[in-house]
């Protein structure tokens, strides 16, 4: 019935996301290497690394409230499958499509609300491409380096952005990169965005909640990190390298489906 359908959609989303994570990882590593030679640090679970998520669970149709987000992470932790892979972190995250108001133009944008920021961090390497720090207050934002250079926006500048029915001013406190947007193009486009035609930015959770009129802790993504780097199933071989990870994903899908069906 309907819940079966829901479950199937979600599983496809998760598996697709795992593949995305793999490709993002490869391109991120190559990209990082060309930018500043910090290639060896990019995956570190340290201040210099970004710690890409190993599994994403996405809510493609709406928003989970704070209570549901926390409950899902709790259920995932409590019912983790018998596996050599150990759960390190489950972090609810919010990501919304929106707008940046630039001069008289409405520029399509994607905004991320990043709270703990342990998994899939914003990357501000010690390199002249980037500067500043992460957003901490609800009126601060880190903008992507391509937004900074393409629209001539710098540290300390105020920008006006929108999401949902909200429209507010934020102060730029950082310029950096994020693994979701290394290839800087709108979703579905094969071509990189021309300067000034696309924006991405990274706010505190409180900042994005305030902008979009959301409740505290609302999320539409769960980023799951396991200890170490698990083996992924590489799409270009017949061998199933990521068997262990596939079992974990199957189990997570069941947990999420069961939890949502019972709420």
Q: What annotation goes with each model-predicted range?
A:
Residues 1-263:
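Membrane transport/envelope proteins' first extracytoplasmic loop
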